Amino acid sequence: MAERKQGGQNNGAGSSVITEVKPKTQKPSLYRVLILNDDYTPMEFVVYVLERFFNKSREDATRIMLHVHQHGVGVCGVFTYEVAETKVAQVIDSARRHQHPLQCTMEKD
């Protein structure tokens, strides 16, 4: 409570002003998930992985697979760190279960 001086004037002692401070937030860093070409993984399996784990249409998955085949690497998508890390693990796990040497990595965008 504010204290009052004689004469009814408020000298401001004991009063406070509450201001709302909005926290400064940053957007999370994004990471590209990459599939690497190899000579052993069937092209159809790469298309399956892109459809299954990255929700790509058959057409987009085929286009990305051909890019990987011709250029050695291709971007599957861009995600936050945790999502990218999970997708990399899912792809590698699926490749191992199907006995393919397919490699998947992530890098900061």
From Swiss-Prot:
Q: Which Pfam families match?
A: ClpS
Which Gene3D superfamilies does the entry link to?
3.30.1390.10
Region described as Disordered: 1-21
SUPFAM superfamilies given in the database record: ClpS-like (SSF54736)
Q: One GO biological process from the UniProt record?
A: protein catabolic process
Q: Which domain of life is it from?
A: Bacteria
Q: Which InterPro entries match?
A: ClpS, ClpS_core, Ribosomal_bL12_C/ClpS-like
Role summary: Involved in the modulation of the specificity of the ClpAP-mediated ATP-dependent protein degradation.
Stored HAMAP family: ClpS (MF_00302)
- Family label: Belongs to the ClpS family.
Q: How does it assemble?
A: Binds to the N-terminal domain of the chaperone ClpA.
Write the protein's name. ATP-dependent Clp protease adapter protein ClpS
